[in-house]
Amino acid sequence: MTDSVVVLLVEDNERNLKLARDVLEYAGFTVLVAMTGEEAVAKAKVATPDVILMDLQLPGIDGHAALALLRADERTAQIPVVALTAFAMAKDRDRAMAAGFDGYLEKPINVRVFPEQVREHLRTEAP
């Protein structure tokens, strides 16, 4: 059931942010928003979301630097972090995965499958 799933959506483009937030909320997710890498790290430490969707190009620290900070903190190290980016080249995906992202979703999002793509990245406690 997704009504208890909390997603931290990190996106600095207001149009992309609104679309992704609206789609996820319609699907029953609770969506927290951050527009910078610094804000994402701070919110994740307090809210401990179930999954973080992280744009890679952000003002201030980028998605890769924010991921490193999240992984270095025991409060946030185990939260799945999924790269959400317009970079669609294989080398970009490989770089994100090598950096430690748990997944990679391309923008623009496909509104029909986006909620299911997010669900696929949730960690379950039971096998």
Task: List the model feature ranges, each with a label.
Residues 33, 58-61, 78, 90:
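Residue-level signal for the "D+5" position in two-component response regulator receiver
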Residues 28-35, 43, 105:
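Short hydrophobic/Thr-rich beta-strand motif most characteristic of the beta2 strand and flanking loop
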Residues 11:
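Conserved acidic carboxylate
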